[in-house]
Each structure stands twice: as C-alpha cells, then as structure tokens.
Design a protein with these regions (language model features):
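Basic amphipathic alpha-helical segments that dock to polyanions
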Residues: 27, 38-48, 176
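Key DNA-contact positions within bacterial/archaeal DNA-binding proteins
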Residues: 36, 91
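Mid-protein regulatory/catalytic core that forms ligand/cofactor-binding pockets
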Residues: 101-188
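Basic, amphipathic "hinge/linker" alpha-helix immediately C-terminal to the N-terminal HTH DNA-binding motif
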Residues: 56-75
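Short amphipathic alpha-helical interface segments
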Residues: 6-20, 148-152
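A short, conserved structural fragment
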Residues: 46-56
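Short acidic, hydrophobic short linear motifs in intrinsically disordered regions
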Residues: 18-28, 155
Length: 188
C-alpha cells in the first residue's frame, strides 16, 4: 500500500502541472477527501519540508520534487509494463501501476527498464524521467484554456484518470494528434 505522503506528493505534482502550484480544494477533489484532511496532510508535508504554502498556493520544494521524480519514474515504468507487456486495459493501468510502484527496489526497476529497452514516456505521454527542478519551476506548457480559439495544439500527454482515459478512447483522441481549438467552455 502506498503511503499517504506519496499519494499527496503525486497529486500535488499532477494538479500543479501547468502552473506549478495547487490549492487545498484541488487536492480534496482529486483525492476524494474532505478539505480538513487536506489541510492536516499539507501541514505535515510543510513540516517535512516537502512543500511550501503561500497565500493558499501549495508548491513542491526541491526535496519534495526529488521524491516525486522517483515516485513518477517507478509509477510510469509500471504503467508501460502493464500496458505493453501485460496488455492490461488502459483504464485499469494507472491504479495497478500505482500499487506496483510501491516496490522500492532500484534493482527491480533497473531490470524492468532494461527489459523494456529503456522507454522514455508512459502510455499517457508522461516522461519517465522528470525535468530538473529548476526547469520545473519555470513551466513552458500551457493549459488548454490559455490557447486562443483557432490555434492548433498537439496532444503530448494527459492525466491518467479513468474518466479521462475513457473520454480519449470514446472520442478517438490519441497522443501526437493535432487539434484546432474551436471554442472554449470555462464552466468545465
């Protein structure tokens, strides 16, 4: 079973992907917990110097980011193995990969990486090796809401929630696909 710290760090990383910060409400929504639980957990992460909080914005520290980089490497390596080698249904992959990534053996992970010929990205477009902390602090990615109508975008990755995966499969969307922004719905 994954630790509560690991779950929070992964969720902070995922919810702060384009703006490099998140808030209690986003964490509570993504984790399916009450806001009070988030406050308690974030305060614990602050005391461990894994995150900082300023004016409601929760950000990973360098130490927290280093832990996330290791977590995401193991998690995404397991995603690839489950999708490509086991051919598990894509909506099932994230949950099972998260459980498997609790294996904290660098030897096992190195062998798995070697067996799969050193893949670079997960089935959902996430990089196995995260960028350096200094690059992480200065995002170059944009959210879809910030792209003007009429511009083209290329799908390079997406959040691997079951709902998102089902949406991509149902809509025929795939990594590498180029789309034109026709309209925006800020209500979603």
């Amino acid at each position: 079973m994954k630790s509560r710290t690991s779950n929070y760090l992964k969720t902070i990383y995922e919810t702060s992907y384009t703006q490099r910060w998140t808030c209690n409400k986003q964490l509570a929504t993504m984790l399916g917990v009450l806001p009070g639980s988030v406050t308690e957990a974030v305060n614990r992460l602050i005391s461990q110097k894994l995150v900082v909080k300023n004016k409601g914005q929760i950000k990973l520290t360098k130490r927290g980011y280093q832990l996330v980089a290791d977590l995401m490497y193991r998690y995404r390596l397991c995603e690839i193995w489950l999708a490509d080698n086991i051919q598990l249904s894509l909506p099932e992959v994230p949950r099972q990969a998260w459980l498997m990534s609790a294996i904290d053996s660098s030897v096992v992970m190195a062998k798995l990486n070697q067996q799969m010929a050193y893949p670079k990205t997960s089935p959902f477009g996430g990089a196995l090796k995260l960028e350096s902390f200094s690059k992480y602090q200065h995002p170059t990615l944009l959210s879809l809401l910030s792209i003007p109508v009429g511009k083209e975008v290329k799908i390079i990755s997406f959040l691997e929630t079951p709902a998102t995966i089902h949406y991509f499969q149902h809509s025929g969307l795939h990594l590498g696909q180029v789309l034109t922004i026709n309209s925006k719905n800020t209500v979603l």
